[in-house]
Structures are given as structure tokens and as C-alpha cells.
């Protein structure tokens, strides 16, 4: 069973899709990465449905079919608010237990939601599975100073399409055929990410046992630094390093996807 629709709050429309197998053993909410959208996550959705899991996926603000300035955000707080809206709207359709999967920025959003819960409620997810989570991008120490110097003169930047997967068909599709791919990147999003880089370093230790899956050929995030930061925050963290895998683990080559 497939359900699709839009949630509206404060003028923001969120495109949401839900897949439900005949017999469900639980549910998964997928949070996609920056510059992605639900349409790129078919491999993962198929695998989860084969495991008899209900699957929820939504397009982030400014991505896919959701509204908002393309690829832009003022604060990662807005992403967390959007995630909470999706969780509330889909709660009655998602059998327990509820799992979270986040790719890159999606992992950062799931982490921020976990850290920001201070109202005494139990965390909604029984597991968080983070694929190449964004804590700090690669070469950030240099790039942040260049960004500060040039931002007053450059509200947007040319996008560089990276070789972030060994799946050549995926890379070709994203670069040449995907109508949802922006070719200019807003400086506002980089500012929001910079705030996140500082913010995650200020959070206290958390007992939640997150599960991190990371490729050792990732050239998008500073993954060694990120692992160190996450291990300092989550002493019960599980870690799986995938040899030869790049950054976009959801769309890696088929052999690597099986391991992931």
C-alpha cells in the first residue's frame, strides 16, 4: 500500500510518502541528505519493504516536491520541526517499533532531534542508523574562512558535482537527468551548517546507542573527525566501516549496498 500527500504548516508544504507492506513488523522513517529527495532512495525503500517494514520518507524543505527556496535553510532547527511534523502526522500509520535512518545531513537532523528532546518524553525512535552522518565537512577549517570572506559578495555558489559513489549510473542521473538537482548552492545553507558544526560540539554525552555506517573513501565529510566526535558524545555507539565505499551510501555500487 502506498500513500502520498502534503503536510502544510506555516506556509511550508512537506511532500510525504508512506509504503506499507501487507504484514508490518515495524516502521522506518528515512531522512534524506542535502540535495537529495525521496526519488533517489528506491534501493533502500525496496530493501526495507522486503523486511516487512512500513517506510516513511519525505522531502526536506527546499528539496524535491516540498516547498521552500531550493537547497536553502536558515537553521537546522527548521529541519527538526519538519521531522517532528512528519512523525506526528504518520504516527497512527506506523506500527512500532520505530527506527530512523539518515543519510549525511539526514543523520545530522536525527541527531539534533535526539539532542534537542528535553521535555522528558521518551525518544520516539528505538534505533538511529546514521549513514555517513554530517558532523563536519571535509576541509572545513580552511573552507569556513573562505566562506566568511566571500559570503558578503556571493549569496550563492556554483555547485561541484562530486564522485561520491561508485555507481556510475547514479552519478550520471544526478548530474544530467534529475530535474530536482540545483546548480547553485545558497550561502544561507552553509551558514546553517556552520552553526550545526559548532552546536554538536556543545552537546553533552548521551547514552542512546546510535549506529553509524561510514565509508572509508568518503571525500565529502571529515569522517575520521566525525567518528571521534560521535564516539565522545555516544559511548554506546555502534560503528561499521565499509571498505571502498564513498559518501552516498544509499546509492553506492550494488555489492557495497549489500554490505551496508
PLM features: residue spans?
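N-terminal cap/lid segment of alpha/beta-hydrolase-fold proteins
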Residues: 1-21
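Active-site nucleophile loop of the alpha/beta-hydrolase fold
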Residues: 128-138
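Conserved alpha/beta-hydrolase
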Residues: 38, 45-69
Amino acid at each position: 500500500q502506498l500513500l502520498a500527500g502534503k503536510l502544510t504548516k506555516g506556509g511550508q508544504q512537506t511532500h510525504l510518502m508512506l509504503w506499507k507492506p501487507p504484514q508490518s513488523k515495524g516502521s522506518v522513517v528515512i531522512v534524506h541528505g542535502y540535495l537529495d529527495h525521496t526519488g533517489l532512495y528506491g534501493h533502500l525503500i525496496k530493501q526495507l519493504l522486503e523486511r516487512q517494514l512500513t517506510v516513511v520518507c519525505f522531502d526536506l524543505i527546499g528539496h524535491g516536491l516540498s516547498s521552500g527556496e531550493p537547497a536553502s535553510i536558515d537553521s537546522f532547527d527548521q529541519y527538526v520541526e519538519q521531522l517532528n511534523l512528519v512523525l506526528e502526522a504518520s504516527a497512527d500509520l506506523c506500527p512500532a517499533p520505530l527506527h530512523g535512518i539518515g543519510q549525511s545531513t539526514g543523520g545530522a537532523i536525527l541527531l539534533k532531534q535526539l539532542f534537542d528532546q528535553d521535555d522528558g518524553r521518551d525518544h520516539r525512535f528505538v534505533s538511529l542508523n546514521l549513514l555517513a552522518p554530517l558532523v563536519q565537512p571535509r576541509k572545513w577549517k580552511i573552507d569556513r574562512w573562505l566562506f566568511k570572506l566571500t559570503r558578503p559578495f556571493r549569496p550563492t555558489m556554483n555547485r561541484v558535482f562530486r564522485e561520491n559513489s561508485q555507481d556510475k549510473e547514479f552519478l550520471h542521473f544526478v548530474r544530467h537527468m534529475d530535474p530536482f538537482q540545483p546548480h547553485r548552492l545558497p550561502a544561507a545553507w552553509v551558514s546553517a551548517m556552520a552553526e550545526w558544526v559548532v552546536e554538536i560540539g556543545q552537546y553533552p554525552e548521551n547514552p542512546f546507542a546510535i549506529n553509524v555506517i561510514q565509508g572509508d573513501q568518503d571525500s565529502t565529510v571529515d569522517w575520521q573527525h566525525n567518528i571521534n566526535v560521535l564516539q565522545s558524545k555516544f559511548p554506546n555507539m555502534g560503528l561499521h566501516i565499509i571498505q571502498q565505499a564513498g559518501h552516498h551510501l544509499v546509492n553506492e555500487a550494488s555489492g557495497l549496498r549489500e554490505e551496508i
